[in-house]
């Protein structure tokens, strides 16, 4: 039975979902360990929703400490078909100003200490990731920004860095030379794992600062980030609410069949332990 149809992952500044009614806390156990926190289940704009605070309530977890596999698996277990992600980012372009929202459609991976797949240990799968976000969810985010009257820029490249330190000036300028738009520490692994779980995914990145590349502008600090987050979290919640309301009920994209031709391992060669661990993802293909 589907417990939730839409998942919301709230990042820095969005630790709860205003307007969520009939809220009940749900603790999920996964084959990959515990998610960042209990998931909050309820209704938002007449839709069944599961909300997860990415860093845990009280912001307890570093980006490198996040159990991305458990977070996405928990959403899958609850029946979630679409994930709306919200996160804080630094801007790598003059045109993306603090308090703007950017809805990226590409990623560059600069992480090195994370697991970004459910597979391995007996199962080999290679999902397509040329277009790493769901166009339907991204467009719904963009339309919701327009409805609320905030700047929501569709498209762009998100650099995902390891952290927890912010960039050096050399790194920031390198990413700018690549044409990247924003920089953050969390969204790439979510996008990869959501694709493997056949869940539609897109993120709305809240610009809080100009990283450290901009001459005549202070380098990014936590104090600066928090100040902008407090200013913008209300708008972020309004956009998410509008996006949930406008989200099409039926999926017409290809996200729901991402694994159809991706599994290379002979079905007869998949170990029993792997089938048990990945049954939720593989059941329709075994």
Task: Show where each model-derived region lies.
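Metabolite-binding pocket within alpha/beta catalytic cores that recognizes anionic/polar moieties
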Residues: 1-131, 285-286
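Non-catalytic positions within long, well-ordered alpha-helices that form the structural scaffold/packing
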Residues: 76-79, 176, 195
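Short acidic/polar active-site loop segments enriched in Thr and Asp
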Residues: 81-82, 181, 200
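Generic non-transmembrane alpha-helical segments
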Residues: 136, 140-151, 238-246
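Active-site/ligand-binding-proximal alpha/beta "capping" segment
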Residues: 147-181
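Zn-dependent metallopeptidase/amidohydrolase metal-coordination segment
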Residues: 185-223
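His/Asp/Glu-rich mid-to-C-terminal helical/loop segments that flank catalytic regions of hydrolases
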Residues: 212-259
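A short, charged, Gly/Pro-tolerant segment at domain boundaries
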Residues: 252-286
């Amino acid at each position: 039975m589907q417990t939730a149809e839409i998942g919301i992952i709230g990042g820095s500044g969005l630790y709860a979902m205003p307007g969520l009614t009939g809220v009940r806390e749900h603790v999920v156990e996964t084959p990959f360990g515990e998610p960042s926190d209990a998931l909050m289940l309820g209704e938002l704009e007449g839709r069944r929703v599961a909300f997860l605070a990415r860093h845990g309530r009280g912001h307890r977890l570093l980006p490198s400490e996040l159990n991305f596999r458990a977070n996405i698996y928990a959403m899958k277990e609850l029946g979630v078909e679409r994930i709306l992600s919200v996160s804080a980012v630094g801007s790598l372009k003059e045109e993306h100003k603090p308090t703007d929202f950017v809805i990226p459609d590409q990623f560059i991976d600069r992480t090195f200490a994370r697991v970004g797949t459910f597979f391995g240990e007996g199962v080999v799968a290679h999902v397509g990731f040329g277009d790493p976000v769901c166009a339907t969810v991204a467009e719904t985010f963009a339309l919701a920004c327009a409805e609320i009257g905030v700047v929501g820029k569709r498209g762009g490249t998100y650099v995902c860095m390891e952290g927890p330190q912010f960039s050096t000036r050399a790194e920031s300028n390198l990413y700018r030379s690549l044409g990247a738009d924003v920089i953050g520490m969390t969204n790439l692994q979510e996008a990869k794992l959501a694709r493997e779980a056949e869940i539609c995914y897109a993120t709305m990145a809240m610009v809080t600062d100009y990283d450290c590349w901009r001459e005549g502008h202070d380098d990014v600090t936590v104090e600066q980030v928090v100040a902008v987050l407090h200013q913008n979290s209300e708008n972020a919640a309004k956009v998410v609410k509008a996006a949930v309301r406008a989200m099409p009920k039926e999926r017409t994209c290809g996200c729901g069949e991402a694994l159809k031709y991706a599994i290379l391992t002979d079905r007869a060669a998949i170990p029993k332990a792997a089938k048990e661990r990945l049954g939720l993802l593989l059941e329709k293909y075994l």
